[in-house]
Amino acid sequence: VAQTVSDSLYKRADRLIAMSEPLQKRLIARTGKPEKDVAVISQYCEDFYAVPCPDPDLQARFAGRFNLVFTGTMTPAQSLDMVLQAVLDARNAGAENLHLLLVGDGMSREALQALAEELHAGDAVTFYGSVPAEKVPSFTTLADALLISLSDSPDLGLTVPGKLASYMAAGKPVIASMNGAGYEAVKESGGGLASPACDQAALTQNLLALYRMPAADRAALGARSKAYYEAHYRRAELLRRL
């Protein structure tokens, strides 16, 4: 019933906005509207994510490590158990200073901490806990790379997560383990390395590749991420397109 009602409303609208190309295609198929009447406008990113915010205490605490930073909610949808195992695999393959810094909380945190103990992860992972959104740039500034991961679900691939936009705003390389629109955005941006959702071996190889990459090449990835944010996710640009 809900879909029938929503489809009816969609068909009556003069124009529709989809947050990604996959959603645009779905709306076109459900409504029969021409492509010109279904615009693609991504979710914007708040401007403060684009401002570097060095924190001397954080930098001192995590100095000497290759910091792979994840920010946000920890649920089964993020497949962080697979990520943790990929990080340990990469460390065993030579990325000995690789460090997974998890900033956030959620229903999966206790299970992840138990898994870390079971796998003897030790100092390979830090569970930092939740911080206010305005504090997140302190962690993205610290990061050598920023991690986004999603489980293998068709619905999760329909949109580009807002987190990816905030990562690109930070101007750091992105390590993505996901399918769909987010995967395609990372590939198109040239600002990071992307592997299919839940592919532990592929994620491990991308972690090793980024770890071994010259610093100048990693900086170039970050610059491309920033440029993609400016063109696609900056609030002022999206409001202009509206």
Place the predicted regions along the sequence by residue.
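Membrane-proximal helix-turn-helix segments that form the acceptor-binding/catalytic region
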Residues: 1-16
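Carbohydrate-associated surface elements
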Residues: 22, 41-44
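Acidic anion/phosphate-binding donor-loop and adjacent secondary structure
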Residues: 28-29, 36, 44-60, 79
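A short, well-ordered alpha-helix in the C-terminal region of glycosyltransferases
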Residues: 29, 209, 216-232
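Conserved donor-binding/catalytic core segment of Leloir-type glycosyltransferases
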Residues: 59-88, 101
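Nucleotide-activated donor-binding/catalytic signature segment of Leloir-type glycosyltransferases, i.e.
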Residues: 65, 103, 110-137
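Short hydrophobic beta-strand element within catalytic cores of glycosyltransferases
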Residues: 145-148, 166-177
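Conserved acidic donor-binding segment of nucleotide-sugar-dependent glycosyltransferases
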Residues: 188-189, 193-200, 209-215
